[in-house]
């Protein structure tokens, strides 16, 4: 078969990018940079009931994709060469995560039991039931739900 016909046949068999792209939903997934990725995966499982969807690497140096009841996020060890720093390296945070759940009191208590530190307790404020913890890796999580409209 001539080379030109062969390349046309290959292109015909290749999946259409348009078909693949139309099946992808637009989402935003935070990527947490920290120190101790392996320990972080275990913490998020214990604290929030996260499930591990993907992991590359072993020990404490990992890249992982996790899900908390369908809400996905990524984590990895900091990599200064890519300008990704942990809160510990920065001396602070640049983003807070809001975890919206049906029972913020239970999830908050579970996170604290797993090793998170309370920043402020779960209370009712601004039409939300909301509390805030900082995880052992320096990331702040607001755990809450909107109040029901009566």
What are these regions (language model features)?
Residues 2-31, 41-136, 143-150:
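Vicinal oxygen chelate
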Residues 33-36:
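Short, surface-exposed ligand-recognition loops at beta-strand->loop->(often short) alpha-helix junctions
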């Amino acid at each position: 078969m001539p080379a030109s016909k062969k390349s046309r046949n290959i292109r015909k068999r290749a999946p259409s990018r348009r078909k693949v792209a139309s099946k992808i939903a637009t989402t935003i997934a935070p990527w947490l940079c920290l120190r101790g990725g392996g320990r972080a995966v275990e913490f998020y499982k214990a604290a929030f009931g996260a499930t591990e969807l993907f992991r590359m690497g072993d020990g404490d140096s990992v890249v992982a994709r996790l899900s908390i009841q369908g809400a996905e996020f990524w984590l990895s060890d900091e990599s200064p060469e890519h300008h990704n720093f942990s809160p510990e390296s920065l001396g602070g945070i640049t983003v807070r995560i809001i975890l919206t759940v049906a029972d913020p009191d239970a999830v908050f208590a579970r996170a604290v039991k797993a090793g998170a530190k309370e920043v402020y307790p779960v209370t009712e404020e601004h039409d939300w039931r909301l509390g805030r913890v900082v995880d052992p890796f320096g990331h702040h999580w607001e755990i809450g739900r909107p109040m029901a409209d009566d």
